[in-house]
Amino acid sequence: MADLINILNHFVQEQPEAVAVRHTNDELTYKQLDEESSKLAHLLQDSKKPMILYGHMSPYMIVGMIGAIKSGCGYVPIDTSVPKERVNMIIDKVQPEIIFNTSDETLEQTNAQVLKVSDIQDSQYPIVFDSQMKQNDVVYTIFTSGSTGEPKGVQIEYASLNEFAEWMVSLNKTGTGKEWLNQAPFSFDLSVMAIYPCLTSGGTLNLVDKDMIKKPKLLNEMLVQTPMNVWVSTPSFIEMCLLLPNLNEQQYNSLKQFFFCGEILSHKTAKVLVERFPNSMIYNTYGPTEATVAVTSIQITEEILNQYNPLPVGVARPGTRLFATEEGELVIEGQSVSLGYLKNEEKTAAVFNFEDGVRTYHTGDKAKIEDGLWFIQGRIDFQIKLNGYRMELEEIETQLRQSKHVREAVVVPVYKNGKVVHLIGAVVPTESVEDNLAMTTQIKHELKSRLPEYMIPRKFEWMERLPLTLNGKLDRKKIAEVVNG
């Protein structure tokens, strides 16, 4: 099997001065990425636990990833947007020996050794390091939403990452040495779809930060300054960008390939994209974090648009088998499947199976196959995706119920065109609500210390009681009807 460090070494030799990663005016060449990651690997080589990698869009986040792979310890990426309480929960679970903090923020409550970028830059360690990562080692652990309020650490094997990167490079028809755009923060596994396929094809990884996402004008300046060839993002991000009337082939004729993952690509969005970029390749992909980013793909063409609405997610990638249970739940089998959740045997046993050397994962997604193509038909549990972020409604409810103002709570997703657009909290308050705005503000303020912003309901509906089913369970369907009514 291919080894991405060996491939990276090839490009270090072939094009040492080519830019490997760029964020605005901050960039690292392939030679610098290799040397800085080797110095970090020397610092990490005795660590028996994964390294926590903390920061936003610094090129040194990529140094952290490559250094952790070379050392063999692997990494756990955490973006600076993650609330401190959640960061502390992850650190408590991982119990790292070393944290590489690429940001200016201070991390509290940790006994780990904290390294800063200057520690690597000033280090006198050798600039060469032979990679220690084995194919069956855990290369990264990404934490996703957990139903009890405790995030789950999804452990991905190095062989799974190598297989994924090789597959993505085979889908990329633009060739080597291209400019790749990465929209996703590194704590979101969609970023993996850009990072490793880019670097193992000798490309330049261009990092989109949160300011660019908030202000499309800044993104536009970036695209003008550096013409992109390959675009990797959630469908929601491209929907926002398509509000810019000049995002088309005439203005950006270098853009030849788009990859979308993380949520449903709507027919409407895909149609606009095909119209604006008729000569580009647009790929719709699907996959949970637990199966190494994505396991299916399909190129969206005029023919596909005319034939299917909603759109299919395509066919399984090599080495992966998909099948649906009698209940319609999609099950993924093969090398792409995670090794399970970090230090959480109960949650692992509930959805993973490792019998006879074959790994399977029960996704919780409803799926069907038609004309040899897979279609995703929503969730069979309470897990949803909003703006590309996967979350469990029960986690938000758990945090809501911790408020002194809340007696009972259910979170209801609001759908538009088959996609979740925002959340509403149905709340039974502990006292009568005199001032709706003040109460909403107070509860949102409390949630901000415990949940990422994207998991906080947009508004709240106050109810005297929550309806129950005949079995005595919460009647979520009825609650949704009342809230949406």
Curated annotation (Swiss-Prot):
It is found in: Cytoplasm. It is an enzyme of class 6 (ligase). Pathway: Cell wall biogenesis; lipoteichoic acid biosynthesis. It comes from the Bacteria. InterPro entries: AA_adenyl_dom, AMP-bd_C, AMP-bd_C_sf, AMP-dep_synth/lig_dom, ANL_N_sf, DltA, DltA-like. It catalyses: holo-[D-alanyl-carrier protein] + D-alanine + ATP = D-alanyl-[D-alanyl-carrier protein] + AMP + diphosphate. Its main location: cytoplasm. GO terms for cellular component: cytoplasm. Pfam families: AMP-binding, AMP-binding_C. D-alanine binds at D189, V293, K473. GO terms for molecular function: ATP binding; D-alanine [D-alanyl carrier protein] ligase activity. GO terms for biological process: lipoteichoic acid biosynthetic process. ATP binds at T144, S145, N284, T285, Y286, G287, P288, T289, D365, K473. Its EC number is 6.2.1.54. Keywords: ATP-binding, Cytoplasm, Ligase, Nucleotide-binding. HAMAP family: DltA. Catalyzes the first step in the D-alanylation of lipoteichoic acid (LTA), the activation of D-alanine and its transfer onto the D-alanyl carrier protein (Dcp) DltC. In an ATP-dependent two-step reaction, forms a high energy D-alanyl-AMP intermediate, followed by transfer of the D-alanyl residue as a thiol ester to the phosphopantheinyl prosthetic group of the Dcp. D-alanylation of LTA plays an important role in modulating the properties of the cell wall in Gram-positive bacteria, influencing the net charge of the cell wall. NCBIfam families: AA-adenyl-dom (TIGR01733), D-ala-DACP-lig (TIGR01734), PRK04813.1 (NF003417). Belongs to the ATP-dependent AMP-binding enzyme family. DltA subfamily. This is D-alanine--D-alanyl carrier protein ligase. It comes from Staphylococcus epidermidis (strain ATCC 35984 / DSM 28319 / BCRC 17069 / CCUG 31568 / BM 3577 / RP62A).
